[in-house]
Every structure is written in C-alpha cells, then in structure tokens.
Amino acid sequence: MVDEADPKGNPIGTELVYEDDSVRVWRIELAPGEMAGWHTHYLDYTTVVVEGDVVERPNADGTVDRIEVTPGAIMRWNQGTLRHALRNIGSKTFRNVIVEVKGRRTGAREAPAGA
C-alpha cells in the first residue's frame, strides 16, 4: 500500500509545488496527447483548471471518462480507491492545480460558480 505521507510513491501531478501540515499542492501540465501517470487519491482534493479543453481519465477498472474542461472551473472530490491516469486529448495544453487536504474528508461536490 502507498503511504499517503510520501507523495513520491504516488505522484498526483507532474510537480509537487507546496506542502505543509494541512495541504499538498500539485501542478499538472500536459501537452496535447501527453498522459500523466497512474495514481490513486488517498486524500480529499480540489482541482482548479487553468487551461485546456478536453481530457480523458482511463480507470483501472477499464472504463474511460471523457471530461470537457473550462479554465477557471473548480471541482472538489473525495478521496478514492480507483486507480486512474489522465490524458490530454484536446488541442490545447492542459494545466491544472490540485490541492489535497490532509486529514479531512469533504465528499465530492462541485464548488458554486464564483467560489
């Protein structure tokens, strides 16, 4: 089992940019056609889309989710056990910021517009 305290063993993004006792902040940047590695979210997290148009999320169970993204969109997710990856299938570079919340379980929901 991967230790959630060690992000090197389960990288959520392409770069870990900040970490303290409360949060861990990742950046993802994927060129068109590029794929981020397989990982599992062991902490609740919030994503903020910076740039991009469409990505797909292949899941370990064989399903694939197509996700149209809008810059500025904010989504909150609960930790999960389904291993997945992320591939940029759009025509623009995909940039995303992920904030993992340590020690808190918020449940999945979309943030209200303007939040």
Task: Give, region by region, the residue ranges found by the protein language model.
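Ligand-binding loop in jelly-roll beta-barrel domains
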Residues: 79-104
